[in-house]
Amino acid sequence: MPAGHGQTAMTREQQPPRFTLNCWADAAMASTATTARPTVAFAHLGCEKNRVDTEHMLGLLAQAGYGVSADEADAQVVVVNTCSFIQDARAESVRTLVDLAEQGKQIVIAGCLAQHFQEELLESLPEARAIVGTGDYQHIVEVLEQVEAGERVNRVSQVPTFVADENLPRYRTTSEAVAYLKVAEGCDYRCAFCIIPKLRGDQRSRPIESIVAEAQQLAAQGVKELILISQITTNYGLDLYGKPQLAELLRALGEVEIPWIRVHYAYPTGLTPEVLAAYREVPNVLPYLDLPLQHSHPEVLRAMNRPWQEGVNGQLLQRIREQLPDAVLRTTFIVGYPGETEEQFEHLLEFVQEQRFDHVGVFCFSPEDGTPAADLPNAVPAEVAEARRGRLMEAQQAISAERNGAWVGRIVDVLVEQENPSSGELIGRCLRFAPDVDGEVRIRAGSHGAAASAGTMVPVRITAADIYDLEGEVVGAQEMVDAVRHS
């Protein structure tokens, strides 16, 4: 179930994939390995916040002399960083664990599933040599040393309190030009459907100075897009400074030489005039707002324990569009919440049609044990929830096609990320697309020979659009000048 502070979803929905190490990170880690240590592979499942935890574990193990392989077949030990956010995510995590167990691998279970089930996991899976909680991954080297000594290890703090900083080793698994930066951990909100606070603990923010220091490290590595993440990014700093400090953080990051800064997981009430002013005034902060709204109807929002959102949605969106006319808006919704009536769903459908978001993800309600919503009466039948999801997605697809189509003819900066070696076609993203959850831009060489390569940021004229993606061609200086003169 997508909490406002949980995973984002995309118009073209997908589960976050298990990654393999990219070649530049893999090579860097291989150079640190020694033959005295076993080789370790990672299977990563879950959101980008989980990804950052995995990257820290990779960095710690490489620093300690472990060989880290992108191929599970080459490894004696596989660390599985699991997700337990919704039932489908748990099922995928368990399938991965069972598959690896059947291959005879020694398994270390990390992440949200370990935090959720703890000792029960060790009892259920004899091949599991250790479990590591969401607040304990910084001890991964010590855990593996205990496993090497023949121990079975339970390293799960009952209440997670750890938050990493710029001094904890890290090897990124994203492309060289893109990095996630976790500004806080945990969540103080208690949405009725969400288990994340139980898995991640209460909010704990990093100091602004720590975040800026890590951003500078990433800039030195060639990062061109920095994505700020936490459970509720607009609440950043509340626990540390006594009030939210996102606007101050954005202004500080504006001094770092990274072309794009993107913010994920913004709560509606946190988009204050000060925050919107920072979006508007800091040149490298993208006008991209990720707002997990979850529903529009006041009664459903009250049942979700989000009563503060009533009356905010429409007013907020109007204010955003007034202050940020080029804003790109993405959101997620839950359909089939217990007690959701047809009238309440129609309210949501009309809201989506009226607000015309750029990107929308829709999830059917999934009851999570240990949350208040799991005990609510008047469950909506699964087939009804699926039908509502289909109707909402169908309505949004037409809107997405229209919103993408409005970009045809524009010249925009595109961060090139991939190249098809056989066709030469390049794949990248402009500011309206976040990695993994939104669409992409398919790029051709320009008519005057202007070209690009992976890892660069180039001007592209958008020539075509569909529901999900854009197409375009690289333009040269003369074409950019001509475009300005004729605008």
From Swiss-Prot:
Domain spans labelled TRAM: 405-476
GO CC annotations, alphabetized: cytosol
Record-linked Pfam families: Radical_SAM, TRAM_2, UPF0004
GO molecular function: 4 iron, 4 sulfur cluster binding; aspartic acid methylthiotransferase activity; metal ion binding; protein methylthiotransferase activity
Catalytic activities: L-aspartate(89)-[ribosomal protein uS12]-hydrogen + (sulfur carrier)-SH + AH2 + 2 S-adenosyl-L-methionine = 3-methylsulfanyl-L-aspartate(89)-[ribosomal protein uS12]-hydrogen + (sulfur carrier)-H + 5'-deoxyadenosine + L-methionine + A + S-adenosyl-L-homocysteine + 2 H(+)
Protein's cellular compartments: Cytoplasm
Cofactor note: Binds 2 [4Fe-4S] clusters. One cluster is coordinated with 3 cysteines and an exchangeable S-adenosyl-L-methionine.
Enzyme class: transferase
Biological processes per GO annotation: tRNA modification
Keywords of this entry: 4Fe-4S, Cytoplasm, Iron, Iron-sulfur, Metal-binding, S-adenosyl-L-methionine, Transferase
Cofactor(s) the protein requires to work: [4Fe-4S] cluster
Annotated [4Fe-4S] cluster 2 binding sites: 187, 191, 194
Domain Radical SAM core: 173-402
Domain MTTase N-terminal, residue spans: 38-149
Keyword check for S-adenosyl-L-methionine: yes
Residues engaged in binding [4Fe-4S] cluster 1: 47, 83, 112
Metal-binding found in the keyword field: yes
UniProt similarity note: Belongs to the methylthiotransferase family. RimO subfamily.
Function: Catalyzes the methylthiolation of an aspartic acid residue of ribosomal protein uS12.
NCBIfam families recorded: 30S ribosomal protein S12 methylthiotransferase RimO (TIGR01125), MiaB/RimO family radical SAM methylthiotransferase (TIGR00089)
Name of the protein described by the UniProt record: Ribosomal protein uS12 methylthiotransferase RimO
The encoding gene: rimO
